Amino acid sequence: MIEDHPVTGVGPNMVQRLYAQYRDPEAVEKVNPHLHNVPMQIAAERGLPALAIWTLFLAVAGTDLWKKLKTSRHRFLAAGGLAAIAGMLAAGLFEYNFGDSEFLMLFLVMITLPFAADRTDLP
């Protein structure tokens, strides 16, 4: 899929529909709802530019959380955000966890909470 559609991907939620055309003839599953790998799923559905942007997002989030870990009075939240990124990346090699809205919401809260907690302009 990625080789045939490197720039745009096959489109959101199209992997299941097109999987049969690309699957290995010896694959156990004839139908697959997703590719069980976050980077592969993003590249297949949305293309390599989207994968690059996703990678940049994670790199910036990780870098900023690392800075928070050293400077924030809520270091434990920054550590939790970094752990969330590490856990998502590890699990994401074997499951498309970004396709699960509950997971995605918790992940985004975990990586943004350290920044919200350090705001001083709140009443």
Language-model region placement:
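Short glycine/serine/threonine-biased micro-segments
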Residues: 7-11, 45-48, 85, 90, ...
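Long extracytoplasmic/lumenal interhelical loops at the membrane interface
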Residues: 3-4, 8-46
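A generic structural signal for secondary-structure junctions
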Residues: 20-24, 70, 114
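Hydrophobic transmembrane alpha-helices and their immediate junctions
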Residues: 46-86
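Short, flexible helix-adjacent loops and helix caps
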Residues: 7, 67-71, 95-98
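Generic hydrophobic alpha-helical scaffold/packing signal
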Residues: 16, 40, 44, 53, ...
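Transmembrane alpha-helices of multi-pass inner-membrane enzymes
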Residues: 80-93, 97-123
